[in-house]
Structure formats: C-alpha cells, structure tokens
Design a protein with these regions (language model features):
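N-terminal short beta-loop-beta anion/metal-coordinating cradle
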Residues: 1-99
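Internal, conserved structured core segments that host functional sites
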Residues: 90, 98-149
Length: 268
C-alpha cells in the first residue's frame, strides 16, 4: 500500500526535490526553517502528503490538540507535507516533516514514488549540526553527495566534504539510497555555533545561497538577508555583555582561523 497521497498532478519542468525535517539533525532549526522559507518565498502550493504518522515517535513530536470550552475540537497528527512551486528555471518539490523513528525503507519508497511521478532526478536534503564555530566568521558548510559533478561544484564553492563515522540520520539513508537509484543527490549541512543552538537565520541564509549556486537556480533571499542582519546584531549585543561568552567566541575564532589557514584549496 502506497504511503504517497497526491491532491493533484501538475505538469512540472525538470523539478528538483528538496527535503528537510525536524529532529536530531536540525540544529538551529536550519532544516525546518529552510523548507519553511522556501515554501513562503516561492509561493509553494500544497501537493500532497506522505502517510507516516505511524512511523513517528509521538513522545518526541506530539500531536497538536485544539481544546475549546472543555471540548476537543481537533487533534492534528504530525506528518510529512509535500508542496510544489512552478518556476522559470526549475520547479521545486518541497518535502518536510519530522525524522521517523523507524520504517525508513517505507519512507524512501514513497519519496522515490513521488519523484518518479513528476520526473524529478535531483534531490537535496538540508541539515543542521552543532560545531565549534564562531558566529563572527563565515558560516561553515559541509556536504555529502552521490555525484562527481555536484562534488566539484560544492568543493569549488568552498564547502567541506563530510568525514564522519557514527550513528546515522535519515539524511545519510536518503542520500545513500539515492545513489543506488542513480539520482543526483546532495546533502547540505549548516554548522551552528555550540553556544547558539537557537533558530539561526544566518546559517539558513548561507545554506540557501549555496543551494542556489550549486543547482544554478535563482532564489529570492531578500527577507533572509534582513533576518540574518537582525540576528547578528542581537547576538553581538549578547556577547558584548557577557565576558565568559566573549572568551568562548575569541577561542573559537582562533581555532577557526587556524583551520582555514591549513585548509587545502580546491581547483576544479
């Protein structure tokens, strides 16, 4: 039985599928905020859903209840929503929800069914991770991919190829299976300062700027530039008023600068 439910079947132009979700790999809300911003800025329209409620840990991602005058009016279960945006260069399919506690293989089948239905051959996931990086330096971004072409683009843009061994998120599972299916796929990760695990529009902006460059699509990021500037101003004021925090930032700046000096540049 398919977990994909479509409300409509529009004709799409070379659609790119972008996936983001809350959970373990959403530091700074980078993943969820990126998808929310794309839905709003692109005027995305509801396309369907993935029936995954039974695969979500409801103690971690609880249903939303509406109670009025002592009566329950609605209980809305968490799930996965699908939106689409029609564009001049390439259409977007936006898939968002919460990391599943199990049944990842069922999710992948539904996701690939969605992509096959609309002829999407390119997939992007967006994640956020906590890192020893200061907010006063350029946002550090890393990636993993299935494609030598996308690898070259990411390296040329200054992104760091991921090196990691440990518990996997759904991102890795999605990218791995995309490679097995022969899709061009890339997972972009925004690095969030250890002392700032709060909604971070600055990192979201950096991720979406690079997404635009890697895939050669235009994105409207004007509001994010404003949000990031306001965020920076507030964080700078906070740091200036806290000597301990100021020392943490100084130490991370030195560490960041040393790593950048020792970094090997990439020539495509």
């Amino acid at each position: 039985l398919s977990r994909l439910v479509l409300y409509k079947r529009p004709e799409m132009n070379n659609p790119i599928t972008v996936v983001g979700f809350g959970g373990w790999a959403d530091a700074g809300n980078v993943s969820t905020l990126s998808l929310a911003y794309l839905r709003e800025s692109e005027g995305a329209i509801e396309l369907g859903r993935l029936e995954t409620s039974d695969l979500i840990d409801h103690t971690q991602h609880r249903p939303i209840v509406t109670i009025e005058g002592g009566f329950i009016r609605e209980i809305r279960m968490p799930g996965w929503e699908i939106h689409y945006a029609m564009r001049k260069d390439a259409d977007l399919i936006l898939v968002s929800g919460y990391e599943l506690s199990h049944g990842w293989d069922q999710f992948i089948r539904a996701l690939f069914e969605l992509m096959d239905t609309f002829g999407s051959r390119t997939l992007v996931t967006i994640g956020g991770l906590i890192d020893r990086t200061p907010h006063t330096r350029p946002v550090r971004l890393s990636f993993l991919t299935t494609s030598k072409r996308l690898y070259g683009k990411c390296m040329a843009l200054g992104l760091n190829p991921s090196n990691y061994r440990g518990p996997a998120s759904m991102h890795s599972y999605i990218i791995h299976n995309s490679g097995l299916k022969g899709l061009e796929a890339v997972s972009l990760w925004g690095h969030v300062p250890t002392y700032l695990n709060i909604p971070n529009p600055r990192v979201v902006l950096a991720v979406l700027e690079k997404l635009s460059s890697i895939l050669e699509i235009s994105l409207s990021l004007e509001r994010l530039y404003v949000d990031a500037a306001v965020f920076d101003s507030k964080v700078n004021s906070l740091v200036e008023s806290d000597e301990d925090l100021k020392e943490i930032v100084r130490s991370l700046e030195q560490e960041y600068d040393e790593q950048e000096r020792n970094r090997v540049s990439y020539i495509d």
